[in-house]
Amino acid sequence: MKVTPLMEQYLRIKEQYKDSILLFRLGDFYEAFFEDAKIVSKVLNIVLTRRQDAPMAGIPYHALNSYLKKLVEAGYKVAICDQMEEPSKSKKLIRREVTRVVTPGSILEDEFLSETNNYMAVVSEEKGQYCTIFCDVSTGEVLVHESSDEQETMDLLKNYSISQIVCPDHLKPSLKERFPGVYTESISEWYFSDLEEVEKAYNLKDIHHFELSSLALKTLAALIKYVKYTMITEELNLKPPLLISQRDYMILDSATVENLSLIPGDRGKNLFDVLNNTETPMGARLLKKWILHPLVDRKQIEERLETVEKLVSDRMNLEELRDLLSNVRDVERIVSRVEYNRSVPRDLVALRETLEIIPKLNEILSTFGVFKNLAFPERLLDLLQRAVEDDPAGSPGEGKVIKRGFSPELDEYRDLLEHAEERLKEFEEKERKRTGIQKLKVGYNQVFGYYIEVTKANLDKIPDDYERKQTLVNSERFITPELKEFETKIMAAKERIEELEKELFKNVCEEVKKHKEILLKISEELAKIDVLSTLAYDAILYSYTKPIFSEGRLEIKGGRHPIVERFTQNFVENDIYMDNERRFVVITGPNMSGKSTFIRQVGLISLMAQIGSFVPAQKAILPVFDRIFTRMGARDDLAGGRSTFLVEMNEMALILLKSTEKSLVLLDEVGRGTSTQDGVSIAWAISEELIKRGCKVLFATHFTELTELEKHFPQVQNKTILVKEEGKNVIFTHKVVDGVADRSYGIEVAKIAGIPDRVINRAYEILERNFKNNTKKNGKSNRFSQQIPLFPV
């Protein structure tokens, strides 16, 4: 195959982006060649053609984003190669360059993104120490986490619902195995070596300004280098890194996030969806962060609660505040798109609409007495109001983005174009009179430009200054010096409008960039106001109460499960009292009675209080917990080769390793994955260890043997779920009371589940026979006997 200059250009650029699908701009299409073309054809279901024996597939340039989305979602990295000059202005081969590399974590466009954060995670490891940096390129957010605990790192990666992992070569196999559905890319070690990247990106004189470890600084350098690589720019929109520290925030393992249904996942209804009545995209993202990172500083928690209380107490102004917030646009993402030169005219309109609300917002905020005034960039607002059309159509350069009156020069060229048709009509009429040809027409086409068309019957009347341009079957077309001059002016006007409007739009964007810091500060404050006002709205809507904090007391009166109550009629409220002396609760009762719901609701109420939310209870006095741990449900890890029992023991090992006297531990059916004898023994030993440790524990179990702990340890109290029997029917009241369950009601639960009557009746027969056998053998009924055999020996 003979290689043309165009193909040489393609191959040279492709060599630099071997691991990407290269979309190469050719006129009105982006083309892919060779193996890339086959992938594009298959994924996008478009025709595979050939050019000089090279497989080729193309997509229209104006539909790039919709096709790009499909390629990225299919797990491909895509390099966009654009024409860097107008074809009409270049007689040689058009200059082309890659303008961006698109990966799941480097997306900026609204049509690709949901309101939630789109996190890329850069993971590094050095001598057993892990560093993870989460970056949302669309908002500029950068979060840093360090740990010597590999599992803690994996938990955080899971909690953040990451879209992409970037890591050194040696970490890729294990991370790919742990997160098979996440796009994972390895980068060479030199990405981590240039710490000057950090200084340049943040304009620092001293790299230690951020107080990050050496490993964290290297990981931050790798992030910066990678974002520069994908965005093809030296100018980045990255906020200063925020350290996720256990000193400031509660660290939640992935089991707890899943077991308490904190955020959207595989389990359907969740706390985030219940609380998320936010009015802004920034607020929704911040609320999720607050849920995943509850505060551990009592003063900070109480400050949030006091603000929520102020908002609750002034419902009229709260409603007006939320109405105003509903008009706020996604300022964070707009600033990012402007910074990376990816903004569209609608972004500037959205920014203007947000800034216009600020004076009224400040007026309302002042009535609560707890908020500072939002900054108000009046000059920027004035520019946006004068420069950008209220409803811009098309792209910059098409003449419908910049307002009339902003640029006299642009208006002059627009006037010329707008009056062109009128001028042509006048010219046509003048020529008809001059020549006496009544059917003379003035027209235009893209090939020949403007022309005068005369039928062959009138050719004898044409003046000497008519220059022939084209001969048709029944007519001929001509040009005159005057029409040629008019055409030149019109074409120049079109070109100049395109150049001018693009330039003016760019200038406005540059002005927005100058206000980046103040705009991001406004966005941050608006997000906080939105979340706090949402928590106030939730408190009113769901009848929540303000929690009070104490040193060691946990007292909940009329507590409710915030998720279950939203989807259940007549939810049964429950009480709990624990303190430093009575801190371990064993809860027995049958399946379906509500043990699991109860212990989860205690965990959720505690967590909600520590994000600054009112809670679903009549009264709540709570300690500030450093961690909330959960061990619930039976699940295996087939991919990791771990049985249900091994998963259970791994989770318990984490709790025993990490819990302190300030932790809340919620256990549900620990020890059920092995034999009864082993299970009871392990559960008892774990209970002893947790009692000694001093943490607060709620342990829901079917092992009634564990209720004997109360006789040996004064810290233990027994609770059960009240069950009423009416004949052969049982009623689960879901009410937690003092005491011990005397029956498991397993057969009754099986009956409710729809097990056939013949099986239920047989189960009753076996139960009765075994009960008699045990009574004869032991001389009395033993509630703590070993598990009864199903069949007679």
Swiss-Prot record:
One of its GO terms (molecular function) is damaged DNA binding. ATP binds at G589, P590, N591, M592, S593, G594, K595, S596. One of its GO terms (cellular component) is cytosol. It comes from the Bacteria. The keyword Secreted does not apply. It holds the Pfam family MutS_V. Keywords: ATP-binding, DNA damage, DNA repair, DNA-binding, Nucleotide-binding. PROSITE patterns: DNA_MISMATCH_REPAIR_2. One of its GO terms (biological process) is mismatch repair. InterPro entries: DNA_mismatch_repair_MutS (IPR005748), DNA_mismatch_repair_MutS-lik_N (IPR007695), DNA_mismatch_repair_MutS/MSH (IPR017261), DNA_mismatch_repair_MutS_C (IPR000432), DNA_mismatch_repair_MutS_clamp (IPR007861), DNA_mismatch_repair_MutS_core (IPR007696), DNA_mismatch_repair_MutS_N (IPR016151), DNA_mismatch_repair_MutS_sf (IPR036187). This protein is involved in the repair of mismatches in DNA. It is possible that it carries out the mismatch recognition step. This protein has a weak ATPase activity. PANTHER family: DNA MISMATCH REPAIR PROTEIN MSH1, MITOCHONDRIAL, DNA MISMATCH REPAIR PROTEIN MUTS FAMILY MEMBER. Belongs to the DNA mismatch repair MutS family. This is DNA mismatch repair protein MutS. The gene is mutS.
